[in-house]
């Protein structure tokens, strides 16, 4: 694992290369990530950097969180995330410090994790890309139904994990292998090539790709 950043999805746009090719990109706003805790092998059994970002009203912060943030000397954030790191990555990091977009460089490949858009209860066609049944030829009312799910006498039951209608979306999704197109240190903005999970305004985690 490697240290990354917590940001917020601003939306998608496009940029044009020198050759005039349109490239779809996603803009990620990254407020400075404040280090709230550094975990070590001696004290915690593993090495990690814990960060927070954004702001939260004091009335929404629990007493335990207030103590944790006060001990680190940082303002309360809207969330807390943790990155597993190596001994080398801990060098130069200290509680109360910040991590910004300069952690990444243009052309670097990253993985982006977010919470996908919730679609509610959906049928098999939308949820699992099932093909529909005949539109005519005697078929009525059953155009988008699943069909048989439990076979006949053998096995005579529905197997666990059978793809059926149910809740779609609103789950943790990671898109791997996205290229960083631009790093704006003045505005604290990252621009990555392609789409990332989640709705506009949702929190995302950007970290160096694990499949380098």
From Swiss-Prot:
The modification N5-methylglutamine is found at residue 153. The gene is rplC. Belongs to the universal ribosomal protein uL3 family. Part of the 50S ribosomal subunit. Forms a cluster with proteins L14 and L19. One of its GO terms (biological process) is translation. It comes from Acinetobacter baumannii (strain AB0057). One of the primary rRNA binding proteins, it binds directly near the 3'-end of the 23S rRNA, where it nucleates assembly of the 50S subunit. The keyword Ribosomal protein applies. Gene3D superfamilies: 3.30.160.810, Translation factors. This is Large ribosomal subunit protein uL3. Transmembrane segments: none annotated. The lineage of its organism: Bacteria, Pseudomonadati, Pseudomonadota, Gammaproteobacteria, Moraxellales. Coiled coil: none annotated.
């Amino acid at each position: 694992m490697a240290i990354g950043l917590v940001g917020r999805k601003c939306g998608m746009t496009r940029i044009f290369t020198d050759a005039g090719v349109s490239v779809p990109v996603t803009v990620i706003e990254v407020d400075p990530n404040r280090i709230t805790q550094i975990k070590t092998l001696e004290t915690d059994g593993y090495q990690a950097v814990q960060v927070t970002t954004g702001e939260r009203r004091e009335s929404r912060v629990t007493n335990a969180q207030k103590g944790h943030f006060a001990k680190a000397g940082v303002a309360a954030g809207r969330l807390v995330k943790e990155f597993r790191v190596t001994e080398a990555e801990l060098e130069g990091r200290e509680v109360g410090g910040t991590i910004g977009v300069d952690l990444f460089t243009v052309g670097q490949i990253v993985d982006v994790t977010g919470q996908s858009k919730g679609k509610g209860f959906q049928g098999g066609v939308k949820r699992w890309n099932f093909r529909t049944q005949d539109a005519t030829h005697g078929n009525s009312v059953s155009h988008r139904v699943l069909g048989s799910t439990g076979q006949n006498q053998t096995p005579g039951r529905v197997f666990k994990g059978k793809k059926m209608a149910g809740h779609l979306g609103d789950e943790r999704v990671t898109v791997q292998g996205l290229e960083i197109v631009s790093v704006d240190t003045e505005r604290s903005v990252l621009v990555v090539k392609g789409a990332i999970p989640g709705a506009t305004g949702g929190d995302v985690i950007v970290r160096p790709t694990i499949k380098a």
